[in-house]
Design a protein with these regions (language model features):
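Cofactor-binding beta-sheet edge motifs in enzyme active sites
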Residues: 1-142
């Protein structure tokens, strides 16, 4: 956490996915990495806001930030194999758990990093402005 700007950088992310029987390991890795990248967005950047008339304020990629490879940490992934009894090859869908699990994992890591300031909860997205305002309120901003 940058105390001067409030920017949060995820430096390392470890994820283990239960893939069932793996048919193509490269596709599985790509799905997990893609799911994790899609989880970084709602955790740190993506917020849908509306104006007083109910119109979406950030309705284009010019003003709606989606993370790129530059914002993604070093992924450390592994797989466990528990064959699905509901598929003839024992395969399972993969990547979705990373998308769903990443935002709360990142939020918990940020709250833990700020716990020495008495922080116990932050709503996502955990934007730099939110973090900087919190640091300022706690007297910890640079």
């Amino acid at each position: 956490i940058d105390r001067g700007t409030g920017e949060v950088k995820v430096r390392r992310f470890v994820a283990v996915d239960d893939c069932g029987n793996i048919i193509n390991p490269m596709i599985v890795d790509g799905q997990i990495h893609g799911g994790l990248a899609q989880g970084v967005g709602p955790a740190l950047y993506e917020e849908i806001s509306y104006d007083e008339d109910g119109n979406i304020s950030g309705g284009s990629f010019l003003d709606y930030y989606v993370p790129t490879a530059l914002e993604c940490p070093k992924w450390e992934t592994d797989k466990t194999v528990t064959p699905s009894p509901h598929h003839p090859f024992g395969a399972k869908g993969v990547g979705e758990s990373a998308t769903v699990g990443a935002p709360p994992a990142i939020a918990n890591a940020v709250v833990d990093a700020l716990s020495h300031l008495g922080v116990t909860h932050l709503d996502i997205p955990i934007t730099p402005e939110k973090v900087w305002q919190l640091l300022k309120q706690k007297g910890a901003a640079e």
